[in-house]
Design a protein with these regions (language model features):
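Short, charged beta->alpha transition segments
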Residues: 71-78, 82-83, 112-117
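Gly/Ser/Thr-rich beta-alpha loop segments that engage phosphate groups in nucleotides
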Residues: 12, 64, 90, 100-102
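Short acidic, glycine/proline-rich loop/turn micro-motifs
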Residues: 95-99
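Alpha-helix-loop-beta-strand connector modules within alpha/beta enzyme cores
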Residues: 46-59, 101-126
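Non-cysteine beta-strand/loop elements that form the S-adenosyl-L-methionine
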Residues: 30, 82-90
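Extreme N-terminal starter segment of soluble prokaryotic enzymes
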Residues: 1-4
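Hydrophobic "anchor" residues on beta-strands that sit immediately upstream
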Residues: 27, 82, 126
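Glycine-rich, positively charged N-terminal anion/phosphate-binding segment
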Residues: 8-78
């Protein structure tokens, strides 16, 4: 059985992830990252992302194909090798922005987005 530690906003910060690593999970996620903040080169977002041991996964939330693709490419360019798109967050403040589970009804758009991500990201990025 594989053990993945899911992203938890306000909880899975660097210190918490360091403690969790003692239990040898197969994969640990950073806190969810806003695609818009990644694209704006937000200092706090990048400080969070760069303060990691290198093998953590990053889960991105956002809406809009171009914004999401740009964010994924930027994250890949700073060495993040495991990326995940959040399509399940039910929180109202996330859904209001068209992100999280608000993406689910848009099957055609999501298929196009995922195909674009697959074609533009390196084969080394999971």
């Amino acid at each position: 059985m594989k053990i993945y530690i899911a992203p938890m906003a306000g909880i899975t910060d660097y210190a918490f992830r360091s403690i969790l690593k003692e239990f040898n999970p197969d994969l640990i996620f950073t806190e969810m990252v806003n695609a818009n903040l990644v694209n704006m080169n937000d200092v706090n977002t990048f400080n969070t992302l760069l303060k990691r041991d290198g093998d953590e996964s990053v889960q991105v939330f956002g809406s809009g194909k171009e914004r999401l693709v740009d964010a994924f490419l930027k994250l890949e360019s700073i060495g993040i090798k495991h990326l995940e798109l959040n399509m399940g967050c039910p929180k109202t403040k996330i859904i209001k922005t068209g992100a999280g589970s608000a993406l689910l009804p848009e099957k055609e758009n999501m298929t196009d987005l995922l195909e674009t991500l697959r074609s533009q990201l390196s084969d080394n990025t999971e």
